[in-house]
Amino acid sequence: MAMIGVMEDSKLHEDMENDMLGDLTSRAREALALFISISLRDNTELNLVVPNGPSWLSHVDKKDLYLNDETLKKITDILVAKDVTGNYNIVNVAIAAAPQHSQKRFVIYIKTSIYVEIVVIGNMKSNLTLIADGQDSTIITFNLSSSNSKRTFNTATFASNGDGFIRVDMCFRNTTWPVKGPVVTLRVNGDMSIIYRCRVEEYQDALYPHKNRQCYREYFLMDTVDFICGNAAAVFQFCQIVHMDG
């Protein structure tokens, strides 16, 4: 009986390893397929927004993204600013004003400032672009943690669930670190999401590319441990991942 038990345990362990290997292989294939779809042939276009972007970008989006960011700012639909120049002074309010299930690109420009809020983009907010003034200029920050009776998944300072989401030139922070355990700063769920020239600062589990197709380009991540976790088919181009002292 003891020998049978050992054999059964061994078979169970082998099955678990095979299942895990199959899952990892499947994810690797998805990531490789996405990587192949992104052309890097022409490095002279690095100053453009997501040059030679993923094949799943629409023709209209590719045309818009070949504009430089200053041109994009001039075609915004909503302006967020802490002074009187903006349509709104709260990022969440501006996002709420964006149309649901939009078939065309809707652009929100967030001017230089520090915005202390939890930003959540619902799954009905599709084809939304957020563009800002730079990683050191436009900062979205909060201090929610798992010690606030929240699952780590729900601690994100910024969470986007809508498909076709694009964000450019901003910084995201979760300032609970290091005293309150693992938290998330940026969580991305929506399919065909692009994060370009953005910065994330965190202590643990900073970036959560949860699922679907995602592309990160010229992205800066500062963390101490468990930098990136998630199940997305995500590609990282020209990114920096920096370890900071805990």
From Swiss-Prot:
Residue numbers annotated as active site: D205, D226
InterPro entries: Pectin_lyas_fold, Pectin_lyase_fold/virulence, Pectinesterase_cat
GO BP annotation list: cell wall modification; pectin catabolic process
Reactions catalysed according to its record: [(1->4)-alpha-D-galacturonosyl methyl ester](n) + n H2O = [(1->4)-alpha-D-galacturonosyl](n) + n methanol + n H(+)
Record's keyword terms, sorted: Aspartyl esterase, Glycoprotein, Hydrolase
Annotated GO MF terms: pectinesterase activity
EC assignment: 3.1.1.11
Pathway info: Glycan metabolism; pectin degradation; 2-dehydro-3-deoxy-D-gluconate from pectin: step 1/5
Superkingdom to which the source organism belongs: Eukaryota
Site description Transition state stabilizer, residues in chain: Q204
List of residues binding substrate: T152
Positions bearing carbohydrate: N127, N143, N174
Stated family: Belongs to the pectinesterase family.
Function in brief: Acts in the modification of cell walls via demethylesterification of cell wall pectin.
Protein name: Putative pectinesterase 57
Name of the gene this protein is made from: PME57
